[in-house]
């Protein structure tokens, strides 16, 4: 294990705690320095939080003339409900999306220039449309006779015999194509309130020849508005001048994606670089455009390719033949996401889509209501695998490229260079399982993987360092395991970090990790020498608990455990200590108790060398080194390192005093207070496990009066 002088300690809950404290400050109106007025409703917030999440507020508060504003009035067309949802998202990282408020949230996000939220809303809508599309798609003849033809649907349904001059919407101004555009996302049921839909913006027309359209795959009906339209490689084809300006009738107060010509794209980008410093990143091999529909291949290839977390979520919603290059250009009035915008949120911390890990430096944000922090598993993983904490082999990425994603990506166009394996990994940071299923990764495993990397001091590979999120670990090429910690400790992984060749041990049990013939349980990190024992342990330990207590809600996997549990209700303690006479209801508790008399302390802290009698004491001690206090009080917000301390603290709010003296009838909130009272007032000996009762014969006659 690395020495304290050269180690880096990762606080896994720091980011979530800071955000939680900021939200509490906002709810108590502490240090809020701006009031946002939306349709006569006022919202108090902190400027720094608004700047960090919204491009609109970023541009306002960075302006020297507007940075001191204390009251900001937003456009009256903005929905207060949508702004309230987005404001809560800024402080909690949770976006409350429902079919009734999706349009209000998306419209407000477009106005606030929160592109990552807009993309999430669009994918939410596309997912809803994809479910309704098969039942709503009319036959070809009925569809061609309908008046609701859209440009891409015309192209998909037109016959091959249509000549090029009769192509609909070809070489027509962008404003004329508005007649074919129905309201945005018309297939989704919306609430009675009307929100600005931005359907009056011009749609890009088709600049492809008949041969190109014939060879291109047809666009699915469930995706009516593609994010980009790439130009063919024919340099003789130019973009009409009509597309170089947005529609004049658009209100300037509304945020929308501008459409630029290739000539003015360069000065616009230079202008945005003046306001926002864009960190340099790797140059992509595949260009793409999101906000600018028409861009030459040579210009787009010079744009930075930044893997965004919206594309992580997009893998759950996009069709299987979706193009790989979904990155887009940021509008001039919107900051880069690496500057002031966070990664895209997930809908729920408990959903499968939410099981993603931020590997770009910010720890995984966990719900403050969950008091469990898997620090013990993190500690065990560091201690048990301290010999294998070297850097991850860089060469293993090349061998795993064929297993990263089950999607069949289309071949790149002729004008673009073929994608290298490194670029493919950069384009698709999400690592799916080999079966394509979105399997949930335990939080403890992700914490183990993150802390192990930080303690080892090894940077990620080039493909992983630019990917903000990791959904699934790569599958081990030797033993087939997908455990997050397996990539760090598998002895079969080829690489220069291991000093000697390790024996090959294959495992057919895909849900476990193996090392030198030892099988690990991915749920609790238990070790087994045989695969059959691991399977039996998985079925018995991590399955349903059939034996339930008839007096409480406790349930158990074994009948004997239930019988032992019932002694809690009956008060029976058949196991007695031969030295001090202490009684226990379980033999394991008696065994642990005997270590007090023998002086045995088998559990050692690998950081400071302290030893403990019980493993629970070691678990609590490890939290001192990590600096974590995972148990918050829901009433006052005070955080505690131990669960028992939190339970004792809650008695302050509830007024409960469960410990009482039988002779004085005094009640105490904590057991330590009762012990002190018994020692001082009744002369009782309280350093044993014997119940703290003092007989009347042993009491001096004057002591009861003192109480």
Curated annotation (Swiss-Prot):
Biased composition (Pro residues): 409-420
Post-translational modification, as annotated: Phosphorylated by MAPK1 in response to antigen receptor activation at Ser-334 and Ser-344. Phosphorylated by ATM in response to genotoxic stress. Phosphorylation induces its degradation by ubiquitin/proteasome pathway. Polyubiquitinated. Polyubiquitinated by SCF(FBXO11), leading to its degradation by the proteasome. Ubiquitinated by the SCF(FBXL17) complex, leading to its degradation by the proteasome: ubiquitination by the SCF(FBXL17) complex takes place when aberrant BTB domain dimers are formed.
Region of interest: Disordered: 275-350, 405-469
UniProt subunit comment: Homodimer. Interacts (via BTB domain) with the corepressors BCOR, NCOR1 and SMRT/NCOR2; the interactions are direct. Forms preferably ternary complexes with BCOR and SMRT/NCOR2 on target gene promoters but, on enhancer elements, interacts with SMRT/NCOR2 and HDAC3 to repress proximal gene expression. Interacts with histone deacetylases HDAC2, HDAC5 and HDAC9 (via the catalytic domain). Interacts with ZBTB7 and BCL6B. Interacts with SCF(FBXO11) complex; the interaction is independent of phosphorylation and promotes ubiquitination.
Bias (Polar residues) ranges: 331-350, 425-452
Alphabetized CDD domains for the sequence: BTB_POZ_ZBTB27_BCL6
Organism: Mus musculus
InterPro entries: BTB/POZ_dom, SKP1/BTB/POZ_sf, Znf_C2H2_sf, Znf_C2H2_type
Phosphoserine PTM sites in chain numbering: 334, 344, 362, 405
Localization, UniProt: Nucleus
Alphabetical list of SUPFAM superfamilies matching this protein: beta-beta-alpha zinc fingers, POZ domain
Modification sites for N6-acetyllysine: 380
GO cellular component, one term: replication fork
Disruption phenotype: More than 50% of lethality by 6 weeks of age. Mice have infiltrates of inflammatory cells in their lungs, as well as multinodular lesions with eosinophil infiltrations into the spleen, significantly more T(H)2 and T(H)17 cells and up-regulated levels of inflammtaroy chemokines in macrophages, but, express low levels of memory CD8(+) T-cells and, in spleen, GC B and T(FH) cells are both undetectable. B-cells express 10-fold lower levels of surface IgM than control littermates and macrophages divide faster.
Protein name, entry field: B-cell lymphoma 6 protein homolog
Superkingdom in the source lineage: Eukaryota
Biased composition (Low complexity): 458-467
Function (record text): Transcriptional repressor mainly required for germinal center (GC) formation and antibody affinity maturation which has different mechanisms of action specific to the lineage and biological functions. Forms complexes with different corepressors and histone deacetylases to repress the transcriptional expression of different subsets of target genes. Represses its target genes by binding directly to the DNA sequence 5'-TTCCTAGAA-3' (BCL6-binding site) or indirectly by repressing the transcriptional activity of transcription factors.
């Amino acid at each position: 294990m690395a020495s304290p002088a050269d180690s880096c300690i990762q606080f896994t809950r720091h980011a979530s705690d800071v955000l939680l404290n900021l939200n509490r400050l906002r709810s108590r109106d502490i240090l809020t320095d701006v009031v946002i007025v939306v349709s006569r409703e006022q919202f108090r917030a902190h400027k720094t939080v608004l700047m960090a999440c919204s491009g609109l507020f970023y541009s306002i508060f960075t302006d020297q003339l507007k940075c001191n504003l204390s009251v900001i009035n937003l456009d009256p067309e903005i929905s207060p409900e949508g702004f309230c949802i987005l404001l809560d998202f800024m402080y909690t990282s949770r976006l409350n999306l429902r079919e009734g408020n999706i349009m209000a949230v998306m419209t407000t996000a477009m106005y606030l220039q929160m592109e990552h939220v807009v993309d999430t809303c669009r994918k939410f809508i596309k997912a809803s449309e994809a479910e309704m599309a098969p039942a709503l798609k009319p036959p070809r003849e009925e569809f061609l006779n309908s008046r609701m033809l859209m440009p891409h649907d015309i192209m998909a349904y037109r016959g091959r015999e249509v000549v090029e001059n009769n192509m609909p919407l070809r070489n027509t101004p962008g404003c004329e194509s508005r007649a074919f555009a129905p309201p945005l996302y018309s297939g989704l049921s919306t609430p009675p309130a009307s929100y600005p839909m931005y359907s009056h913006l011009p749609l890009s027309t088709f600049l492809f020849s008949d041969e190109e359209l014939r060879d291109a795959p047809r666009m699915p009906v469930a995706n009516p508005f593609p994010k980009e339209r790439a130009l063919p490689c024919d340099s003789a084809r130019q973009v009409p001048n009509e597309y170089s300006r947005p529609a004049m009738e658009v209100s300037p107060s509304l945020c929308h994606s501008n459409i630029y010509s290739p000539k003015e794209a360069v000065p616009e980008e230079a202008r945005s670089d003046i306001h926002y410093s864009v960190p340099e990143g790797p140059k992509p091999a595949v260009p793409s455009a999101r906000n600018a529909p028409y861009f030459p291949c040579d210009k787009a290839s010079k744009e930075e390719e930044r893997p965004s977390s919206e594309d992580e979520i997009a893998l759950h919603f996009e069709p299987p033949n979706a193009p790989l290059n979904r990155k887009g250009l940021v509008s001039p009035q919107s900051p880069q996401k690496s500057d002031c915008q966070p990664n895209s949120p997930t809908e729920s911390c408990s959903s499968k889509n939410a099981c993603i890990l931020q590997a770009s430096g910010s720890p995984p944000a966990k719900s403050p209501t969950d008091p469990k922090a898997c620090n013990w598993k993190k500690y065990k993983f560091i201690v048990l695998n301290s010999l294998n904490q070297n850097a991850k082999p860089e060469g293993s990425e090349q061998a795993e490229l064929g297993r990263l994603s089950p999607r069949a990506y289309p071949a790149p166009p002729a004008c673009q260079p073929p994608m290298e394996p490194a670029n493919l990994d950069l384009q698709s940071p999400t690592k799916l399982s080999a079966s394509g299923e979105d399997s949930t990764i335990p939080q403890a495993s992700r914490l183990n993987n993150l802390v192990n990397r930080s303690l080892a001091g090894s940077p990620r590979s080039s493909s992983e360092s630019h990917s903000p999120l990791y959904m699934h670990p790569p599958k081990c090429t030797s033993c087939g395991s997908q455990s997050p910690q397996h990539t760090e400790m598998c002895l079969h992984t080829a690489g220069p970090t291991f000093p000697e060749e390790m024996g090959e041990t294959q495992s057919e049990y895909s849900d476990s990790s193996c090392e030198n013939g030892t099988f690990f349980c991915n749920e609790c990190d238990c070790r087994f020498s045989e695969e059959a024992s691991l399977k039996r342990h998985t079925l018995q330990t991590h399955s349903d608990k059939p034996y339930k207590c008839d007096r409480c809600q406790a349930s158990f996997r074994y009948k004997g455990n239930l019988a032992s549990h019932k002694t809690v209700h009956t008060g029976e303690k058949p196991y007695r200590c031969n030295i001090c006479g202490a009684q226990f209801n379980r033999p394991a508790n008696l065994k642990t108790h005997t270590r007090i008399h023998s002086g045995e302390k088998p559990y050692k802290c690998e950081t400071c060398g302290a030893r403990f009698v019980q493993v629970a004491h070691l678990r609590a001690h490890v939290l001192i080194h990590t600096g974590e206090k995972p148990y918050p009080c829901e009433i006052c917000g005070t955080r505690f390192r131990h669960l028992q301390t939190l339970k004792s603290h809650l008695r302050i709010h509830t007024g409960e005093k469960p410990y009482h003296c039988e002779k004085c009838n005094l009640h105490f909130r904590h057991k330590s207070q009762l012990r002190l009272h018994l020692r001082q007032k009744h002369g009782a000996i309280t350093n044993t496990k014997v119940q703290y009762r003092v007989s009347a014969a042993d009491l001096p006659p004057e002591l009861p009066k003192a109480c």
